Amino acid sequence: MSSDISDAVLDGDAYEQAAALTRRVFPLSLTGKIRACSAVLAAAVLLFPAITTRRELIAQLEPAADAPPALVSVVALGSAVTFLFGLVFVRQRHVVDTRTLDLETATRLVRTEDVLMTFAVSTGLLFILVPVALLLAGALSSDLVVYLYEQDIRLYRPAGGSYATTARVSLAGAVLASVLLLVEAATR
């Protein structure tokens, strides 16, 4: 590990030196950051089976629920934002690969990446992974869902007037993850 850092500082280009010398919250390569965004997007695929398995229970708990649960809209928003962050990381990698950078510019790019990754992780975590995890927990345990409703936590509360159906959002998660991976591979 320390020999890798020494090699990057002594023999690497300006970006490798900046990446080795700059303290970062997420010490991942740009490719790793792009793939992390893709993995989070792929988690949205679990939304459809998690809600479909509890269709009867949802009808009992939310009798007037014709619209999909509000968490579906949250996951849709998170998917769009996470996909955009993934594209920004693809562009960032293109900049690093095609431009000659000095150490100061490279350091600024590394810090910018870290800030962007902070937002990408928080968006993906809060808007995709947490809702999917809650809905999966509900799919695995109907007793948990009933308990949450007794505590006035309406896990399947409907979203009024939403175009984001469960199937569309699950499919969009798979498509966006695939597109991001294809763009990442094509620009490598």
How would you describe each model-predicted region?
Residues L46-T52, T123-Q151:
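Alpha-helical transmembrane segments and their membrane-interface junctions
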Residues M1-C37, Q92-L116, A185-R188:
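Haloarchaeal acidic low-complexity proteome signature biased toward cell-envelope/secretome components but also
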Residues K33-T52:
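The first (N-terminal) embedded transmembrane alpha-helix
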Residues L77-G78, A106-V130:
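Transmembrane alpha-helical segments of multi-pass membrane proteins
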Residues L57-A65, A137-G160:
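Membrane-interfacial helical/loop segments at transmembrane boundaries in membrane proteins
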Residues P63-G86, R168:
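Alpha-helical transmembrane segments
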Residues M1-D13, L135-S142, L171-A172:
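Transmembrane-helix bundle segments that line or gate the permeation/cavity pathway
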Residues G78-V95, L171-R188:
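Transmembrane alpha-helical segments in integral membrane proteins
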